[in-house]
UniProtKB/Swiss-Prot annotation:
UniProt keyword list: Coiled coil, DNA damage, DNA recombination, DNA repair, Metal-binding, Nucleus, Phosphoprotein, Transcription, Transcription regulation, Zinc, Zinc-finger
Basic residues: compositionally biased ranges: 50-68
Name the UniProt record assigns to this protein: INO80 complex subunit B
Protein species of origin: Mus musculus
Subunit structure: Component of the chromatin remodeling INO80 complex; specifically part of a complex module associated with the helicase ATP-binding and the helicase C-terminal domain of INO80. Interacts with RP9.
Gene Ontology terms describing biological process: chromatin remodeling; DNA recombination; DNA repair; positive regulation of DNA repair; positive regulation of DNA-templated transcription; positive regulation of telomere maintenance in response to DNA damage; regulation of cell cycle; regulation of chromosome organization
GO cellular component labels: Ino80 complex; nucleolus
Ranges where the record places region Disordered: 1-84, 143-165, 201-220, 262-287, 312-331
Length: 375
């Protein structure tokens, strides 16, 4: 960043005879001494900005001396006429980059505006004078031996580039060289590709296109169509139209039926009324077929027939058994018979009587001292 360089200007009346020598030396490139009435600028800043605060204090002290000195020597300075000459200096970090003396300049008669950052403005109480930006650029180009600023030619260059790009796009469109998105194909930089990608790219470029040209004049000729073939073709087309119309009609009927079924419960009578209407409208369910029931129980077995159905054969009724119910065959057991022994066929009532029966009838392992017999 450029540091603010404080300058001290002090009017110095030069009546010394050495001033003539200074004027002569200016023609040979030496330092030019200021004329009477001009200001001498002294740069008080280092290359790195060291000692800036000290110089400010000295400037503050010299300011009072300068005012006092101006009051004393106001008379002789006003007597000498000053030449209308403007000296511009470009300072950056305390170093003077260029100096240009302009004998004539143009003052811009416009309204108040913010000063350009390219203008050199001193901190002293001097009148502000504006210089046109074009003239200032010309001075900079002369001092730095640079070419004129290319900013004026930018709009024209952009228009030319757009026209060239549009022309290249139209040419690629005619040749069919656009990509899938309709843009120009970008050139592939092989330096950015890997070795494998470079090899695949070269292989694709070396191989011919797999597309084959279509035969123009060769091939078998199309067979001639007779009247019979034309009639068959028309018949097949008519059948296809009829089938398509039939399918459309069936689909339409199915859609209407489905809509009426879904819209029926939302009628005026509600779901119950719609359900009752559907029940009333349907045919009565067929009566159940006559059924024969057979029941077997402790009191006996029964066979039931529906009313109006005759029995196939007359059933002979058995006489009821007379006498008391049979009892257990084991001597001394008062319990009634519950089942028969699988080996002897005797009536038994429990497992204990079963073992006693085996011992008595078949001579089993149970002896006379068996606990079963004792119980």
């Amino acid at each position: 960043m450029s540091a603010c360089v404080p300058t001290v200007s002090s009017p110095l009346p030069l009546q010394d005879p050495m001033s003539k020598l200074w004027r002569r030396g200016s023609t040979s490139g030496a330092m030019e001494a200021p004329e009477p009435g001009e200001t001498l600028e002294l740069s008080l800043a280092g290359a790195h900005g060291h000692g800036v605060h000290k110089k400010k204090h000295k400037k503050h002290k010299k300011k009072h001396k300068k005012k006092h000195h101006q009051e004393e020597e106001a008379g002789p300075t006003l007597q000498t006429p000053a030449k209308p000459q403007l000296k511009l200096k470009i300072k950056l970090g305390g170093q003077v980059l260029g100096t240009k003396s302009v004998p004539t300049f143009t003052v811009i008669p416009e309204g108040p505006r913010s000063p350009s950052p390219l203008m050199v403005v001193d901190n002293e109480e001097e009148p502000m004078e504006g210089v046109p930006l074009e003239q200032y650029r010309a001075w900079l180009d002369e001092d730095s031996n640079l070419s004129p600023s290319p900013l004026r030619d930018l709009p024209g260059d952009l228009e030319g580039q757009e026209e060239e790009e549009e022309q290249r796009w139209l040419d690629a469109l005619e040749k069919g060289e656009l990509d899938d998105n309709g843009d120009l194909k970008k050139e592939i930089n092989e330096r950015l590709l890997t070795a494998r990608q470079r090899a695949l790219l070269q292989k694709a470029r070396s191989q011919p296109s797999p597309t084959l040209p279509l035969p123009v004049g060769g091939g078998c000729p199309a067979p001639a169509l007779t009247e019979e073939m034309l009639l068959k073709r028309e018949e097949r087309a008519r059948k296809r139209r009829l089938q398509a119309a039939r399918r459309a009609e069936e689909h339409k009927n199915q859609t209407i039926e489905r809509l009426t079924k879904t819209a029926a419960p939302s009628g005026r009578g509600g779901r119950g009324a719609a359900r009752g209407e559907r029940r009333g409208g349907r045919a009565a369910a067929p009566a159940p077929a006559p059924m024969v029931r057979y029941c077997s129980g402790a009191q006996g077995s029964t066979l039931s027939f529906p009313p109006g159905v005759p029995t196939p054969t007359a059933v002979a009724q058995r006489p009821a058994p007379s006498g008391p119910a049979p009892r257990c065959s084991v001597p001394g057991c008062p319990h009634p018979r519950r089942y028969a022994c699988s080996r002897t066929g005797q009536a038994l009532c429990s497992l204990q009587c079963y073992r006693i029966n085996l011992q008595l009838r078949l001579g089993g392992p149970e002896g006379p001292g068996s606990p079963l017999l004792a119980t």
